[in-house]
């Protein structure tokens, strides 16, 4: 196959990547500026260098305050304001940022939320219905994963199921039209331990939603599907994999023969999905543990085996993440980084050979690492947590109706987590009212050491973005805050 000819602006579109030809990028941008009459010809070179430096900066470090970027360029405020205006007139530079090493932050989270206006609402402390609502319907879990923050043995009383499921249906009814991905089922505890999950999924589908369930699939048996036919109305089932054999599963979950059962459940689900011609998507979340990067090849073989069982229906997606637990600086050692890069290259080659239609989501840090950048996971500490959190962006609701401000706080009996409950949904109090009351009364939580573990990656990104936007506004850059909008 002949490669397409590179356009004159291609160097600019790639300028944020490690090893990019920055000289060629500056030349291309300078030509664009001069040809379009955007700057005088004698200023095109200097202006282009500044613009390319901005693209490199925000393509790698998306949470940089504007004032910091201005100081880095060494220009005054008027000159910087002109540069920001010019940046928006060179689409190739925006492409460079969105496809750079930090592109997953921009495309997966920041820009979609900007376009919905939820950051504006959070900064203005305006009560709006959350952009994302996680329903945590599971009363218990059959695993005891060593990394899970769940208190051993903690569970919800089964007597809470009927009232809890009625409450969940009322929350689903509140979700505004226009955002079909606004709600998902997760935990907390295992969603499939709730015998009413299928009914809730069907109710969500009837409401115009496309919900995903995050599950370990241990209970995704044919009998469960027969008892809960509404599960077939889900948009997707995302199974968290805790290994690729029984030994690895037992080390992680504490349960014998768990992998074997999950694998057989998924094989049978593949067969049933094909027989029913169901549009439901099936995929995985897989964490690459230290020293196990080579297991990515076995992951592809595992998926290929499931494809064989699907009679033409193949696994739709896999989300790959690196284990950053215990890394306070959010960085990987150089040796481990090199090992992981090599493993990812081999993984992608095996995917092309055996599972060519598989969609792969590498998340934030691994996306950077794949480009050759020095991957560093964002870390929010108690000092930078926002007392007001961000209920306009996301909340989580457990079986009791408690509305949690962070995704990893929604576990029963978890020490300190109740401080992050904004309120409770009841027959007399809607989710809309809980959020409105929390925001309007100026609800705040003073973070203490360890509270950062109540936040997942999404919460951390949202917090970093809000801190950045607030800093930009305070520095007098309200009209350009956040760089890209």
Curated annotation (Swiss-Prot):
User: Keywords of this protein's UniProt record, alphabetized?
Assistant: 4Fe-4S, Antibiotic biosynthesis, Iron, Iron-sulfur, Lyase, Metal-binding, Oxidoreductase, S-adenosyl-L-methionine
SUPFAM superfamilies attached to this UniProt entry: Radical SAM enzymes (SSF102114)
Q: Which residue windows are coiled coil?
A: none
Tell me the residue numbers annotated for binding [4Fe-4S] cluster.
141, 145, 148
GO terms classed as biological process: macrolide biosynthetic process
Which InterPro entries has this protein been placed in? Aldolase_TIM, DesII, Radical_SAM_PqqE_MftC-like, rSAM
Q: Does the keyword Hydrolase apply?
A: no
What more the UniProt record tells us is: The reaction starts by the transfer of an electron from the [4Fe-4S] cluster to S-adenosyl-L-methionine, spliting it into methionine and the radical 5-deoxyadenosin-5'-yl, which attacks the sugar substrate.
Matching PANTHER family, A to Z? Answer: PQQA PEPTIDE CYCLASE, RADICAL SAM DOMAIN PROTEIN
Q: What is its quaternary makeup?
A: Monomer.
Full protein name? dTDP-4-amino-4,6-dideoxy-D-glucose ammonia-lyase
């Amino acid at each position: 196959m002949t490669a397409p000819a590179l356009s004159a602006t291609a160097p600019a579109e790639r300028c944020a990547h490690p090893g990019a030809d920055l000289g060629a990028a500056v030349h291309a941008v300078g030509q664009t500026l001069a040809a379009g009459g955007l700057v005088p010809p004698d200023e095109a070179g200097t202006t282009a260098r500044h613009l390319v430096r901005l693209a490199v900066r925000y393509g790698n470090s998306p949470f940089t305050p504007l004032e910091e970027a201005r100081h880095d360029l060494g220009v005054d405020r008027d000159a910087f304001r002109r540069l920001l205006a010019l940046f928006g007139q060179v689409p190739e530079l925006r492409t460079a940022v969105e496809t750079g090493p930090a592109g997953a932050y921009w495309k997966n989270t920041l820009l979609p939320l900007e376009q919905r206006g939820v950051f504006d609402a959070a900064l203005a402390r305006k009560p709006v219905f959350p952009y994302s609502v996680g329903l945590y319907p599971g009363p218990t879990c059959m695993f005891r994963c060593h990394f899970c923050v769940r208190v051993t043995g903690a569970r919800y009383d089964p007597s809470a199921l009927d009232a809890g499921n009625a409450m969940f249906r009322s929350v689903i009814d509140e979700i505004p039209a226009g955002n079909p991905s606004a709600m998902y089922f997760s935990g907390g505890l295992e969603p499939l331990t709730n015998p009413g999950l299928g009914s809730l999924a069907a109710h969500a589908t009837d409401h115009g939603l496309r919900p995903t369930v995050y599950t370990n699939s241990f209970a995704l048996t044919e009998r469960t599907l027969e008892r809960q036919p509404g599960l077939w109305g889900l948009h997707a089932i995302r199974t968290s994999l805790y290994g690729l054999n029984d030994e690895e599963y037992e080390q992680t979950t504490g349960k014998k023969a768990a992998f074997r059962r999950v694998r057989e459940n998924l094989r049978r689900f593949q067969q049933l999905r094909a027989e029913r011609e169901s549009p439901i998507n099936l995929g995985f979340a897989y964490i690459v543990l230290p020293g196990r990067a080579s297991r990515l090849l076995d992951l592809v073989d595992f998926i290929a085996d499931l494809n064989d069982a699907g009679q033409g229906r193949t696994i739709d997606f896999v989300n790959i993440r690196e284990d950053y637990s215990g890394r306070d600086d959010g960085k990987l050692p150089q040796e481990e980084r090199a090992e992981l890069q090599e493993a990812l290259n081999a993984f992608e080659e095996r995917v092309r050979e055996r599972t060519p239609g598989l969609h792969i989501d590498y998340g934030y840090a691994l996306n950077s690492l794949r480009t050759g950048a020095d991957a560093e996971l964002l870390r929010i500490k108690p000092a930078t947590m926002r007392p007001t959190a961000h209920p306009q962006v996301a909340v989580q609701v457990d079986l009791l109706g408690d509305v949690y401000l962070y995704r990893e706080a929604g576990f029963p009996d978890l020490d300190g987590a109740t401080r992050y409950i904004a309120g409770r949904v009841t027959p007399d109090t809607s989710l809309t009212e809980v959020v409105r009351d929390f925001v309007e009364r100026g609800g705040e939580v003073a973070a203490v050491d360890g509270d950062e573990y109540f936040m997942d990656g999404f919460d951390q990104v949202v917090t970093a973005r809000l801190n950045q936007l607030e800093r930009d506004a305070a520095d007098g850059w309200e009209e350009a805050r956040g760089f890209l909008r």
